[in-house]
Amino acid sequence: LAAVKRQAIRGTVSYDPNIRPALLGTPDEARPHVEAIVALADVVKASDEDLKWLYPDRPIEDVLREWLQSGPSLILCTRGPWGVYILTAAERDMLVVDPLDVELVDTVGAGDSLMAGLISGLVDADLLGSAEAKQRLREASWDQILPAIHRGIITSGITILYQGAYSPTREEVNEILAADKTLRG
């Protein structure tokens, strides 16, 4: 937690709790630690499975709104074939973005690929890195953030086309972006 606090002062922090119940004890034991890091992070990505384990009796949407109020600028919740919930500090409404429509082969690495594509897109949009970028992310509109979200979703969609934790290239992602004008932002 000390390392996260130090980094939060200098620049952006991204966090994926990547819940592994066998390593964390009970939800009641894990929840305070996860919430402390969420409050320090700028970008948070969790899966619906992570949230159902941490908060078994609460609607996911309520948890995401509570997390957003604790400090992050951008929160995503991946929901497999049901797409991604997205909340930002600057926009009032929750957005739901559909997944890429592809034939599933293997979900290993899908969440990590989504986060990699998202972070890459946010860096390209100059919304990550410095304290100034951190403030821009906090104030960013959907128009500024959606291209990075689409990049993340496409990256994840390509990953699940292959067996194992496949990592798509930027060229593979850009091919899909070029083919679909609605994804370019």
Predicted regions and their residues:
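Conserved beta-alpha-beta core of the PfkB/ribokinase-like small-molecule kinase fold
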Residues: 1-66, 72, 82-84, 89
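Conserved phosphate-binding/catalytic region of the ribokinase-like
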Residues: 56-185
